[in-house]
Amino acid sequence: MKLKTFLIVGCLGGLFTLSSCTAPTNVKDYSVYVNPFIGTGGHGHTFPGAVVPHGMIQPSPDTRIDGWDACSGYYYADSTINGFSHTHVSGTGCCDYGDVLLMPTVGKQQYRTTDPQSQRLAYASSFSHKNEIAEPGYYSVFLDTYQVKAEISSTKRGAIHRYTFPENTESGFIIDLDYSLQRQTNSEMEIEVISDTEICGHKKTTYWAFDQYINFYAKFSKPFSYTLVTDSITMDNGKRLPVCKALLHFNTNKDEQVLVKVGVSAVDIAGARKNVESEIPGWDFEKVRKDARTAWNEYLSKIDITTSDKEDKAIFYTSLYHTGISPNLFTDADGRYLGMDLEVHQGDTLNPIYTVFSLWDTFRALHPLMTIIDPDLNNHFINSLIKKHQEGGIYPMWDLASNYTGTMIGYHAVPVIVDAYMKGYRNFDAKEAYKACLRAAEYDTTGIKCPDLVLPHLMPKAKYYKNAIGYIPCDRENESVAKALEYAYDDWCISIFAEAMSDFESKAKYERFAKAYEFYFDKSIRFMRGLDSKGEWRTPFNPRASTHRSDDYCEGTAWQWTWFVPHDVEGLVNLMGGEDAFVQKLDSLFSADSSLEGETTSSDISGLIGQYAHGNEPSHHVIHLYNYVNRPWRTQELVDSVYRSQYANSIDGLSGNEDCGQMSAWYILNSMGFYQVCPSKPVYSIGRPAFDKAVINLPEGKTFSIVVKNNGKKNKYIESVSLNGKALNIPFFNHQDIVNGGTMEIKMTDHPTKWGVLSPALSSKKEE
């Protein structure tokens, strides 16, 4: 049948009053250092909206609909706002969400977009960045087209909007349920008016998350008349068209404020209503804003830095802010949540479930950072992953809205769990976690509750080849080298977990798998290289060649992937021909031609220093490899170079996708002076601290301080290090040193030194 438009008009009555705000408290305000606009330009893909740490709801302005730079809905170069939707992902390279769009209007409401490919909706408004404010837990902008000031704040499960209108007899709102980022397919959709101040609805979308369910409940402080519109879905004969938009109408006086409260839930509308009513019972916008700021200050205060450089302070606390956006809470206020089996489960709000696990990115630094600043929260993340295995049949690779997406490679829930376990954080069922680790490493397509299109990505044949013949042939499996290297690392993690579980047979098996990286190293050229099913090297070979997601590597080149053996650096050094040969090759990485070759090179290969690509995750540990081969001064000067070239207090201040906190976590750890090269091995590599002092406020009132003497822009080299008053002569220390509390003192100088260089007799013990 042809597309039709249906209008339903009604008028209702009622009114709510506003309460006063509460008085501020006297605490150190770290939030003033945060610039949420960092990463909203370039390809950082962050958003400036009003969120609280790891909250369920992310109200934020949407300035464009589709394309790579619409992943978060907001792009700083844009000059129009389509509205304020309530779900967003931060810093990702894949796109989804943008649900439940709300937009204030003044005048006759336009809702039919003449150009279906336009990035601008019919009711969009122009705006100026000079009239835009973003801070932790608060966002404000003046909508020029309607002369309306928009303000947003949020709690964990609810959002509150405040709009200041001009005098007009045609003021109102548009709630657009049909809208979503990337123009997703809506297989279910409905809006219902409950009263003259309440609207609810639900929809199911199919996109990156194959079966995403979203329910909403909205409460308005001012009564409205309404028009319900359906204009976007053609249904079979005999079925009514679902309502996709609500046009709300009312009169406003000059500077009249109208407030809106919105709750969302993946479970049902009742859950969405309870979420917002339990957390925002009244209409006190300023209280919600203040509480959101307090929540962020509690999170940001976990690390206190001392520096005279305001730009560096903004970068640091914005980085810490970005690590607090996801994973996102997914348990409703009544304890219910949608599981990986897409069934509703009754859970516990004290042990909530989370979603948005970008594990290919975040196992590297985000989760190791969490073991330092909030191990209890990290345990909640781990318990969520275990639940996802139990409900869906396997650990997720990239979980979005309780959907297996199959995005990226590896089984990196494993290092997240094993890293916590090896650091002594074990508030989870270790036996169940271990069983799930073994399941993730084996090729078995049975019992996994995911769409057929996702299954080959979630359970690739690469696992079969790894286990059956010992390596992954490049003529049988895409991205064979990258998968093999990450599997070898994940399998090493399983081997040490097996030992802890007294499963010595599995320990031996996975230790053997952990050495599989050796198959791919071509000693004649000293690169990791594709090996086909006949045992022959991939030819032709070009270490700068890239075909995005369709070659032997994953979002990278042979230059970037050759170094991914974090669990056995000594073994990689030996393959290279010893320390001197390894250093020569590593130096070449940073001086190589930065150009890429190929018709469809990967846009993710960014932030290049030579062929080192800081804008994507496979390179993130590489600089610290110099510490393993007696060249610690190279680690120090290159970390300093990354600070200066890859991070800035600007809209394009990130060299690549922020990736759900990973790019930021790298900066946080390194700027304090250390980095964990191999998650699951609780050892930190010392680099170049950026600040005069950093104090980590640990649980139970302890602190670990890094005090830097003679610090400065030119003084990027370490002269000496002491830990709790004792000289530390190796460029490594243990996680337990942080947990115990204490002080590390680092003295800097302006020239390379021999600090951290070990004699041959001590070299093999450098990480002990």
Which ranges hold each PLM region?
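Sec-dependent N-terminal signal peptides
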Residues: T5-G14
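C-terminal motif of bacterial Sec signal peptides marking the signal peptidase cleavage site
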Residues: L18-S20
